[in-house]
Amino acid sequence: PRPPPPPAPVAGRRFDLIASNPPFVLTPPAVREAGLPLMEYRDAGGPILPGLVAGLAEHLEPGATAVMLGNWEHRGTGSWRDTVAAWLPEGLDAWILERELQDPVEYATMWLRDGGLTPERDPEAFDAALEAWIDDFEARDVRGVGFGYLIVHRPRRPREPWRLLEEVTTSGQGVLGPHVAEVLEVRERLAGLDDAAVADLRPLLAPDVTEERHLIPGAAEPTVILLRQGGGLGRTLQASTAVAALAGVADGELSVGQVASAVAALSELNAADAAALRAEMVEATRHLLTTGFLHPGN
């Protein structure tokens, strides 16, 4: 069962933004029994983080966001996504980003050193604590520990929430905060748009996006087209020629539907293929907008 939220001095209060670096380190009791003292600023993350996340619904105003750092276990053959998804409160959007994955030995060694226990200073104590930590992980079939961000958002109006739990290890240039805020805003807007409304959008290509083409010598058409993001999360997207064409003319003047019609006419597509092309561009527009490659324009 999910642990209840811990008592909080902010009980009954709501906020527009919550930022938290809670004690999230997964330090097993056996480690402290082996001689490593509890460090209040970081330890006991196992039961604390799920409770904090579960209680966010009581503290977020409509349109508000909570951002947390956290760890979660990768157990057995199960998915870490299922573990973290079980923490999330109903009715709220959630974007969970796993930024790094460490194996148990790496994880335990890092936090033992952070606590001042190193093999150079006290090899016997270090080995005992490391063994206790690894024994606990093995007993619970923990095969890795993920590090990342938990971003939880209350919709401005009641609607079906969206959930995205993904592994993204790349990074773009600059700070991440504005990118996160834009993604949440775009997703809020797209949640109320059907495909016809998305086709009417006039998107703008983000200024940090570049295109990379791979061609076999002598070939007229590229074998691979990549769109690369310089900011945000530094994502790379493999694009079809149609999606690359959309990105190439996304200057805020033409709608997605107009671009689809123009490409279909130039390619002399029949009605069925033209409809499929339009659907592809609409779907791609949603993805490019929610990852920051495109801005909504109108």
Regions found by a protein language model. Give the residues of each.
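S-adenosylmethionine
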Residues: 1-117
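Intrinsically disordered, low-complexity coil segments
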Residues: 8-11, 159-160, 218, 266-274
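Generic detection of long, well-ordered alpha-helical segments
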Residues: 12, 142, 274-278
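Residues that form generic nucleotide/phosphate-binding pockets
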Residues: 87, 133-136, 249, 262
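Rossmann-like AdoMet/SAM-dependent catalytic core
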Residues: 92-245
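Long, charge-rich, low-complexity alpha-helical segments
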Residues: 152, 232-298
